[in-house]
């Protein structure tokens, strides 16, 4: 490569690196400088005050699982000859 094409490649690389370095990640609900919008913060605080608990509908066919027992008790029940 001659000197002018090397210079062009270096300038392009410098521009790409500068863009990545100085760009800011924008996320939903965030303002420049890493600050959150007040409305979203207020909604979060209200949810925390109420406990943020949602009532789940009860399943009609749900059953309570049997309590787990130690392995040796289970093996004795299944193999009475030991």
From Swiss-Prot:
Residues 1-23 form the signal peptide. One of its GO terms (cellular component) is extracellular space. Pfam families: GnRH. One of its GO terms (molecular function) is gonadotropin-releasing hormone receptor binding. InterPro entries: GnRH, Gonadoliberin. It is found in: Secreted. The modification Pyrrolidone carboxylic acid is found at residue 24. The modification Glycine amide is found at residue 33. The keyword Manganese does not apply. Keywords: Amidation, Cleavage on pair of basic residues, Hormone, Pyrrolidone carboxylic acid, Secreted, Signal. Stimulates the secretion of gonadotropins. PANTHER family: GONADOLIBERIN, PROGONADOLIBERIN-2. Belongs to the GnRH family. This is Progonadoliberin-3. It comes from Oncorhynchus masou (Cherry salmon). The lineage of its organism: Eukaryota, Metazoa, Chordata, Craniata, Vertebrata.
């Amino acid at each position: 490569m001659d000197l002018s094409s090397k210079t062009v490649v270096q300038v392009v690389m410098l521009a790409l690196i500068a863009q990545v370095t100085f760009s800011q990640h924008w996320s939903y609900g965030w303002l420049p400088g890493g600050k959150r919008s007040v409305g979203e913060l207020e909604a979060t605080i209200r949810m925390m005050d109420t406990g943020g608990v949602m009532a789940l509908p009860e399943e009609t066919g749900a059953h309570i699982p049997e309590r787990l027992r130690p392995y040796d008790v289970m093996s004795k029940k299944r193999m009475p000859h030991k």
